[in-house]
Amino acid sequence: MSIVKEAHNVKVLGSGEKTIVLGHGFGTDQSVWKHLVPYLIDEYRVVLYDNMGAGPTNPDYFDFHRYSSLEGYAYDLLSILEELEIKCCIYLGHSSSAMTGVVASIFRPDLFSKLILVSASPRFLNTDDYYGGFELEEIDQLCQAMESNYKAWIAGFAPLVVGGDMDSVAVQEFSRTLFNMRPDIALSVFRTVFTFDLRHFLSQVTVPCHIIQSSLDVAVPVAVSQYLHQNLGGMSIVEIISTEGADCFGSYRRGSEMETKRGSDDAVTIALR
């Protein structure tokens, strides 16, 4: 196995003609897609990977300087595509990985036929003329809480982001993947994600984008999805859904339902058409 495949725990499933690459968000790993993958493998070649710093990755490979910006993650994504000799793919990214796909598509637009951006935000911090959802003081307080007591921070952060109590499957899953991250790496990634400003990249995007946004997402206001739609350089559409919490956790909450039903109104299904 190559270094790239080993470092990112790359898995390739299915044998369809089209390739879809799934990128997970902060605090999770590729297991977040476990309820979605069974519905893709009959029609697509599905590529799963872990972002560097995620629990299943080797923390010794985490370069704090490289991953202090999303460009480092974008170059990792491009390396994976190159290693697998993927000439063109659909990229489905959640949260920070959605923006990783945006940046990677600017570097190599030929490798992407479509970007599906779930709970994407080019900037989480508010400015005088932009509403991202957070003030810098709030992010600083969250970082201080992480440094002070990482376990206690997870107990408060996971239910808030996912939307549910600690007994819910979705919250327990998110808590598990957060616990699997080394605390200092989790803090570094968190600070990078919640303080980046990628708005200047948007006009350079030429790949078609399908934006999926939950109306109840506590981390990304609906206004951000409209901002993306208005400022992306290429064609884009926005789909607002009513799933509570961060949208990638919908598969955990609806696990049994998704295993028995693939509704025509499923957001990802629609985006793949």
Swiss-Prot record:
Keyword entries, A-Z: Cytoplasm, Hydrolase, Nucleus
Listed Gene3D superfamilies: alpha/beta hydrolase
Xref: InterPro entries: AB_hydrolase_1, AB_hydrolase_fold
Top-rank EC class of the record's enzyme: hydrolase
Pfam families on file: Abhydrolase_6
Catalytic residues of the enzyme: 95 (nucleophile), 217
Tissue expression per record: Expressed in stigma.
EC number annotated for this UniProt entry: 3.1.-.-
GO cellular component terms, semicolon-separated: cytoplasm; nucleus
Locations listed in the record: Nucleus; Cytoplasm
Gene Ontology terms for molecular function: hydrolase activity
Primary residence: nucleus
Source taxon at top rank: Eukaryota
Function: May be involved in plant olfaction during volatile communication.
Family: Belongs to the AB hydrolase superfamily.
Name of the protein in its database record: Karrikin insensitive 2 receptor B
Classification of source organism: Eukaryota, Viridiplantae, Streptophyta, Embryophyta, Tracheophyta
